[in-house]
């Protein structure tokens, strides 16, 4: 993500930005929320591909969003909200064994539930202070209080 942001700086055009793929961030060993924060803070987040995977280098599992890393998915969605992302969300999953319509419906429900949970976290008011203090237990207890989907 850092190298892609440098490219955005070099191109220096208002219509040149990035699409983040959660699964690709995971496979590259990145925290997807950190990547979203880096790109969002610079106003260069133009698209988001939502999926999940087991983070093996070179693998693109394309699993349902939040199915393997639910807390990372919640953190990612909360970061999108923090930076007022209002662009497109794409589900980049590969339903090889599943009914594709059923998987798509699940992805929509899961994304909506995570979005609502992130809104509750942000509305509670202490999320930014807890993360600034690096209070992991405080964040986990906050998630517990507002309800993890």
Can you annotate each of these PLM segments?
Residues 1-149:
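Histidine-acidic metal/acid-base catalytic patches
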